[in-house]
């Protein structure tokens, strides 16, 4: 009897390729056109296209030159790998059933019309619901675990990448996975068709749900992305609140592809109150569906986040958090751990926390460990700028190297970082080698990532007195130099300069606010630069 072995959850699994003990390997021939018909989707795609055109009818071809980078190479693009099926896949890689797509189209158009007169009340709209679910939830999640099968056409590298993704989502959530025996509802991973695509969520009406990992898709970032779809997760830029974080440039997208940029309404999507994450593995690349190789379709409103967009390294902390929320993993713990710095309780060990990147310890109260004892730790900021230089070389058998630091300033102060020089390979998402600075007070989303030389001479101010940062190298040598210091919490940027408004209060009732006032200097007040 023929058999094959796979490493699964740390164990070596023996899979029989013939016999009736298990049905782990399939030889059934199946392709995307066996699941979806263009005639079923075109009318609905046309409706979404019209909706996007109408919503962005006042948009002009507008982009900041600073968002165009001289990339050393183009990273993996799921959209390009799926070019053959552009007319049938939703948002480039989702095999949405006619029923699902109809709900999305109806919800999207109704929400857009209803939201127009309520733009002033965006905050209330945003806080009502936020994560990935529809009115059929929780029937759309795999509550009893995820049975899965491999098609015989899958290459060894594809199988390894799929199993790595399965093990990741098993380890990071409460979801159970198991090779299929005789279950009627299961995931079937195939390699005999082109592209990387998946169905979305559990759909009992389909029985087997297909996930394609074709040639070029055999990477953990891709397989974890497609498996997230199968677990019920949509793309990050589909969020109905995306316009608060990114700007869409419809003029650089072909008219018949605009439907890929429709937003999904709260009726089909919820984000569980978690922040928008440009660094999500579920986010488009900046140039996705662009007619021009270097002109982005999506630009971040915070320009320092532009290089963070489009990573395919693997799921971010927010991605993991959303899946845990979606599958109600916290409910498995009688008592939640007292997590700090945005961490949440690990449902597989309720006494410890899962931590945002840069943090470690049982409760995320510590700095995460670095790969080497020769780097990492605390840097204490002073008013006078201090210089920091680091180089990570790829000269040993260890490929993935990360050095993690925390810059600390006194309470009531902000940290200033000025990047002097970056020497690195420039790619979208900066997920191979780079610098990540967490300048926001919310440490959960991926921070400002930089890997392109154009990032030099950039000055950034934090929102709090703590800045975690990660210097990482996975492919090539990486080096960065920057200066760091602190200013008062009242400091702000004005035409690129740091200005501190000082208010003097005195018994005569005179109030002065003038950062350039010579009077303040005479009185001994000092302006930090």
Model-flagged regions — what are they?
Residues 242-354, 360-371:
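Metalloprotease/metallohydrolase-associated module, dominated by Zn2+-dependent proteases
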Residues 3-5, 334-529:
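Domain-level representation of secreted and single-pass membrane ectodomains enriched
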Residues 187-189, 307, 447-450:
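Trp- and acidic/polar-enriched beta-sheet ligand-binding modules for extracellular glycan
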Residues 5, 12, 34-36, 152-154, ...:
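Residues that form ligand- and interface-recognition hot spots within folded domains
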Residues 114-144, 150-291, 400-402, 412:
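Metzincin-family zinc-dependent endopeptidase catalytic domain
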Residues 3, 11, 16-152:
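Primarily auto-inhibitory N-terminal propeptides
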Residues 165-168, 226-230, 280-281, 322, ...:
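Alpha-helical recognition domains of nuclear gene-regulatory proteins
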Residues 163-165, 298-301, 369, 429-433:
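Short Gly/aromatic-enriched secondary-structure transition segments
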